């Protein structure tokens, strides 16, 4: 099975972007409550 760099990058971005977005949102909420 050949590793598709473009597909791998797209998958990584698809996972990382929402995760980082939720993480930032959580940090903002936590700092507001503190």
Swiss-Prot record:
Record InterPro entries: PSII_PsbM, PSII_PsbM_sf
SUPFAM superfamilies hit by this protein: Photosystem II reaction center protein M, PsbM (SSF161033)
Primary role: One of the components of the core complex of photosystem II (PSII). PSII is a light-driven water:plastoquinone oxidoreductase that uses light energy to abstract electrons from H(2)O, generating O(2) and a proton gradient subsequently used for ATP formation. It consists of a core antenna complex that captures photons, and an electron transfer chain that converts photonic excitation into a charge separation. This subunit is found at the monomer-monomer interface.
One Pfam family of this chain: PsbM
Originating organism: Stigeoclonium helveticum
Compartments where found: Plastid, Chloroplast thylakoid membrane
One cellular component term from this protein's GO annotations in UniProt: photosystem II
Transmembrane segments: 5-25
Keyword Transmembrane helix found: yes
Subunit structure: PSII is composed of 1 copy each of membrane proteins PsbA, PsbB, PsbC, PsbD, PsbE, PsbF, PsbH, PsbI, PsbJ, PsbK, PsbL, PsbM, PsbT, PsbX, PsbY, PsbZ, Psb30/Ycf12, at least 3 peripheral proteins of the oxygen-evolving complex and a large number of cofactors. It forms dimeric complexes.
Metal-binding keyword on record: no
Name of this chain's protein: Photosystem II reaction center protein M
Topology of this chain in the membrane: Single-pass membrane protein
Keywords linked to the UniProt accession: Chloroplast, Membrane, Photosynthesis, Photosystem II, Plastid, Reaction center, Thylakoid, Transmembrane, Transmembrane helix
Family: Belongs to the PsbM family.
């Amino acid at each position: 099975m050949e590793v598709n760099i473009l597909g791998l990058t797209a998958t990584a971005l698809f996972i990382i972007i929402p995760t980082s977005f939720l993480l930032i949102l959580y940090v903002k909420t936590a700092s507001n409550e503190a």
